[in-house]
Swiss-Prot record:
<dbReference type="InterPro" id="IPR018079">
    <property type="entry name" value="Ribosomal_uS4_CS"/>
</dbReference>
<dbReference type="InterPro" id="IPR002942">
    <property type="entry name" value="S4_RNA-bd"/>
</dbReference>
<protein>
    <recommendedName>
        <fullName>Small ribosomal subunit protein uS4</fullName>
    </recommendedName>
</protein>
<keyword id="KW-0687">Ribonucleoprotein</keyword>
<feature type="domain" description="S4 RNA-binding">
    <location>
        <begin position="97"/>
        <end position="160"/>
    </location>
</feature>
<feature type="region of interest" description="Disordered">
    <location>
        <begin position="31"/>
        <end position="55"/>
    </location>
</feature>
<dbReference type="GO" id="GO:0006412">
    <property type="term" value="P:translation"/>
</dbReference>
<dbReference type="InterPro" id="IPR005709">
    <property type="entry name" value="Ribosomal_uS4_bac-type"/>
</dbReference>
<comment type="function">
    <text>With S5 and S12 plays an important role in translational accuracy.</text>
</comment>
<comment type="similarity">
    <text>Belongs to the universal ribosomal protein uS4 family.</text>
</comment>
<dbReference type="GO" id="GO:0019843">
    <property type="term" value="F:rRNA binding"/>
</dbReference>
<dbReference type="GO" id="GO:0003735">
    <property type="term" value="F:structural constituent of ribosome"/>
</dbReference>
<dbReference type="Pfam" id="PF01479">
    <property type="entry name" value="S4"/>
</dbReference>
<keyword id="KW-0699">rRNA-binding</keyword>
<feature type="compositionally biased region" description="Polar residues">
    <location>
        <begin position="42"/>
        <end position="53"/>
    </location>
</feature>
<dbReference type="InterPro" id="IPR001912">
    <property type="entry name" value="Ribosomal_uS4_N"/>
</dbReference>
<dbReference type="GO" id="GO:0042274">
    <property type="term" value="P:ribosomal small subunit biogenesis"/>
</dbReference>
Length: 207
């Protein structure tokens, strides 16, 4: 499956906000001008962005935050739309409960990309069973852990240490000494940090 492998800072500049693709703990704001588009001098335009353009940009931003490609993102939206409740919130909950995102939220990876790599390299177990599919949906009560052979990896130890300092999300409980965590419940919308306006995505797919 094709994925963007270019400079991560360029994606954040394109969206005009830090997507935290390089690190969840270190902001890019001090390193580059997030309000300047990629290009030699930053692309500028006096034209007003259309409603469609604004909606499309929001969708692209969320796809980049979670590392999801278009076809998969459409499937998530279709599932979110089928479920009861608010479609936008359902969409974010589906994305937040992806295994790679849960590994990231528990602090085992410093970025979602790093967490995805840990899953793909079979360094993660779910309820004691080795998991290697980043998109696997984690359910309330599931226990996610680092395999014994991977516990000494410096990047995992460092990421977990930084996550502990910054604080864990309320919907996960992590035992750093055991390198494992429990997905307690689906996060509420207010619990999901990030500059995301999911209603724009719902409007886009409702056109």
């Amino acid at each position: 499956m094709a994925r963007y492998i270019g400079p991560k800072a360029k994606l954040s500049r394109r969206e005009g906000t830090d997507l935290f693709l390089k690190s969840a703990r270190r902001s890019l704001a001090d390193k580059c001008k997030l309000d300047s588009k990629p290009g030699q001098h930053g692309r500028t335009s006096g034209a007003r962005t259309s409603d469609y353009g604004t909606q499309l940009r929001e969708k692209q931003k969320v796809k980049r935050i979670y590392g999801v490609l278009e076809r998969q993102f459409r499937r998530y939206f279709a599932e979110a739309d089928r479920r009861k409740g608010n479609t936008g919130e359902n969409l974010l909950q589906l994305l937040e409960s992806r295994l790679d995102n849960v590994v990231y939220r528990m602090g085992f990876g410093s970025t979602r990309a790093e967490a995805r790599q840990l899953v793909s390299h079979k360094s993660i177990t779910v309820n004691g069973v080795v998991a290697n599919v980043p998109s696997q949906q984690v359910k309330a009560g599931d226990v996610v852990a680092i395999r014994e052979k991977a516990k000494k990896q410096a990047r995992i130890v460092e990421a977990l240490s930084l996550a502990e300092q910054g604080g864990m999300p309320s919907w996960v409980a992590v035992d750093a000494k055991k390198f494992e965590g429990t997905f307690k419940q689906m996060p509420e919308r207010a619990d999901i940090a990030g500059d995301i306006n999911e209603s724009l995505i719902v409007e886009l797919y409702s056109r």
